[in-house]
Amino acid sequence: MAQRITYRRRCSYNTRSNKVRKVKTPGGRLVAQYVKKVVNYTKCSEAGCNVALNGIAQVRPAEYATIARSAKTVSRVYGGELCHTCVRSRIIRAFLTEEVKIVKRKMISKPKTDKKKKRSQKK
């Protein structure tokens, strides 16, 4: 008859956190080896992007406290939050909106100078 294995921890139910794999030891015994949960990779937080972030460690949330800061972030604006394409598009969008504001200011100030020139030419 096959050898039976028992749980090593207190929880005796087949839950998601209590998954077990059968492993044969060098001594020939079958023992229960606990399997860690599958880790979800860190994704870009921009709406509709959901790209995996490169350079960020894929660990369980509790393990983030123990790993180095260099494994948790990327040395860039929004590093560890947004992917590089989303950061690039945000920078370009911000630049273009600033350009539009400058152009609007120039367009508003131009007619005033034209009126002054016309008045000085009439005199």
From Swiss-Prot:
The keyword Ribosomal protein applies. Coiled coil: none annotated. It comes from the Eukaryota. The keyword Membrane does not apply. Pfam families: Ribosomal_L34e. GO terms for cellular component: ribonucleoprotein complex; ribosome. GO terms for biological process: translation. One of its GO terms (molecular function) is structural constituent of ribosome. Keywords: Ribonucleoprotein, Ribosomal protein. PANTHER family: 60S RIBOSOMAL PROTEIN L34 (PTHR10759). Belongs to the eukaryotic ribosomal protein eL34 family. This is Large ribosomal subunit protein eL34. The gene is RPL34.
